[in-house]
Amino acid sequence: MDKKTIYFICTGNSCRSQMAEGWGKEILGEDWNVYSAGIETHGVNPRAIEAMKEVDIDISNHTSDLIDNDILKQSDLVVTLCSDADDNCPILPPNVKKEHWGFEDPAGKEWSEFQRVRDEIKLAIEKFKLR
């Protein structure tokens, strides 16, 4: 069976979508190709890297990428992780499903916010896997 493709999108591909890609590969990797991107690129937030390292997931080699139309078109599911990405997501082909899983942006906030958002994203992906 061919793997399906899930594409996590947020504003800057800096925190939330990077953590979602890390968790997605860890939790869904057997059945899904997992990618992330942003409406813009802000660079991978070092605190997102550190938060994922704390749970033994290495995202230090991830890059902050703009939405790739080829990946977008071949995705089975696009998941927006913030309202900006949800509002500005490109028009999707009819075969691509879209869901919005909103998470607060931890950038510029306390360390505990990175941990909280990281753990919320993990829970959302675990629930998704059970569907």
From Swiss-Prot:
Q: Has keyword ATP-binding?
A: no
Q: What class of enzyme is it?
A: oxidoreductase
Give the CC-aspect GO terms.
cytoplasm
A molecular function (GO) held by this record is: protein tyrosine phosphatase activity
Q: Name one GO biological process term.
A: response to arsenic-containing substance
| Catalytic residue positions | C10, C82, C89
Coiled-coil segments on the chain, per record:
none
Q: What does this protein do?
A: Catalyzes the reduction of arsenate [As(V)] to arsenite [As(III)].
What's the protein here called? Answer: Arsenate reductase 1
